[in-house]
Regions:
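N-terminally biased helix-coil "hinge/interface" segments that flank
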Residues: 1-512
């Protein structure tokens, strides 16, 4: 048996794994997420390989989605202090780096910030040339503070990234042991949000290096010698090496994988997906089989950013959500991975959301649960209201739309959902997140501002499409499988010359 893929999703409660042969699910497994993460991964992967009778040499690739880096940021855990350099000349001084950050996170991460010569105007003219001497002086100051991660952001570097690239080379020469993140590789237009995303990336670089090494070691522990890919926020894959450099690009991979898996398992490409895990419920919209991306500023751990993220609405409701009888409420706190030990239906002493549906006779596992009928009815109504409200928030119109239920916690939903044309809970719904990881494609995205110089806009669009196609190949896509997924173009009326901004995204199947 050959050409097998393993998909893995590492959540805060469970680690799910799935083994796929083409479009066929051969085996699934769910293991509690372990404190060291790696042993949970190797255990889940080993389980699906054992179930199928496959050999380690049959596995051509492992695709892994994780919330490891997002959780570290939210919990302020394992974060590096960062040196922040802004190439701006005399501009932007009224809005210093990290303005608007939560104070405790800013104090933990922001240990040095310097505004330096450089940057560009909105029309591409230089504000000031880069000053190497000033940059090297800043490097000396950062070395005095023993900083080992640097975030560089230039004004309008999303349009002209060359100064940032030059600054990175200088910093790497002066601080050879430091990680260097530059904003033009991470965010879009919008100085503060792009700078914030770059700082977040920089503070996670040491954790990402250790985590990816641990993930690779978990494969070696079960004798897997195949490439490891990591899921990105937009539902596509990147290499493990790239994930070391850009941990922020994995933040939303959990709900994104679930949505991609829901599309594959249900065969429906346009729908609302409700993904209920042990702790949270995530609701998003599928458009042509891919998660709808948000067009708004995204807050991560209270920090405004502007990188690609799916438009997902989340609340603290899951199978392990704790039920309180005094004020009659459910969540947002959860017993998480201890559900099998603490829930009443498994012999524990904590009333959870799972116990509510067990008391209603909606599930056939565990011990009988004897709860007050009024409490059960009230909590069940609360959960129903939460789901209905979430679905209503993400709908694009008043027209009914299919709703796909996935995740192990989707057993909480046993009622009609307002606005749903139909409700589906596909086979293997509990492993949709891992299926989505295994089915993911690779992508290439190009976002450019071009002066038309008399050319028709269609010619400029074709130029950027070719660049996106090549970017997709560079990311590891099979050339003949590539298709253009999305094109956006807009005139830029504030420029003195005829110009437009064009964004093109291409996706393709992973090359063998």
């Amino acid at each position: 048996m050959t050409q097998l893929r393993v998909g893995v999703d590492v959540g805060g409660t469970n680690t799910d794994a799935v083994l796929l042969h083409g479009n066929t699910v051969l085996a699934t497994a769910k293991h509690p997420t372990t404190p060291d993460v790696a042993s949970g991964i190797s255990g889940a992967i080993g389980d699906v390989i054992s179930q199928s009778g496959a050999m380690p040499g049959d596995i051509e690739a492992v695709m892994l989605g994780t919330t490891h880096f997002l959780n570290a940021l939210i919990e302020h855990r394992n974060l590096m202090p960062v040196g922040i350099l802004r190439l701006c000349g005399q501009a932007t001084g009224s809005a210093p780096p990290m303005c608007g950050w939560p104070q405790d996170l800013a104090e933990k991460v922001g240990h040095y910030a310097k505004l330096l010569p450089g940057g560009f105007e909105f029309d591409g003219r230089a504000i000031e040339p880069l000053n190497e001497a000033a940059l090297r002086d800043a490097c000396a100051q950062m070395q005095d503070k023993r900083l080992l991660s640097v975030a560089i952001t230039g004004v309008f570097s999303a349009l002209r990234p060359e100064q940032e690239a030059e600054a990175r080379a200088i910093v790497q020469d002066a601080m050879p042991d430091a990680y260097v993140s530059i904003s033009s590789e991470i965010g879009r237009l919008g100085l503060l949000e792009r700078e914030n995303a770059t700082i977040l990336n920089a503070c996670l670089r040491d954790l990402s290096a250790h985590a990816i090494t641990a993930y690779e070691a978990s494969l070696q522990a079960i004798e897997l010698d195949c490439p490891l890919y990591i899921s990105q926020n937009d539902g596509t894959l990147m290499s493990a090496a790239r994930a070391r450099e850009f941990p922020v690009m994995t933040f939303a991979s959990g709900p994104t994988n679930s949505m991609r898996g829901a599309a594959f398992l249900s065969g429906i490409e346009n729908a609302i997906v409700v993904d209920i895990g042990g702790t949270t419920t995530d609701v998003g919209v599928l458009m042509n089989g891919m998660p709808r991306e948000t067009s708004a500023v995204v807050e991560v751990a209270g920090v405004r950013t502007n990188f690609r993220m799916p438009d997902v609405y989340s609340v603290g409701l899951g199978g392990g959500s704790i039920v309180r009888s005094d004020a009659v409420s459910v969540g947002p706190d959860s017993v998480g991975h201890a559900l099998m030990e603490k829930a009443l239906c498994f012999g524990g002493d904590t009333t959870t959301a799972t116990d509510i549906v067990a008391a209603l006779g909606q599930v056939a596992f565990g011990q009988p649960v004897d709860l007050d009928a009024s409490l059960v009815a009230q909590v069940d109504q609360q959960m129903r209201g939460i789901i209905d409200d979430m679905v209503d928030r993400v709908r694009l119109s008043a027209d009914p739309i299919p709703v796909i239920l996935v995740g192990g916690g989707s057993i909480l939903v046993h009622h009609p959902i307002e606005g749903a044309s139909r409700i589906l809970r596909p086979e293997h719904f509990g492993a949709a997140n891992a299926v989505g990881a295994a089915m993911s494609q690779v992508s290439g995205e190009v976002d450019r501002t071009l002066k038309l110089n008399g050319r028709p806009r269609s010619a400029a669009v074709e130029e950027v499409k070719e660049q996106a196609h090549q970017a997709c190949i560079d990311a590891g896509a099979l050339a003949e499988s590539i298709e253009i997924l999305d094109i956006e173009h807009m005139a830029l009326a504030y420029l003195t010359e005829d110009a437009c901004r064009i964004r093109v995204k291409a996706v393709g199947e992973l090359a063998k």
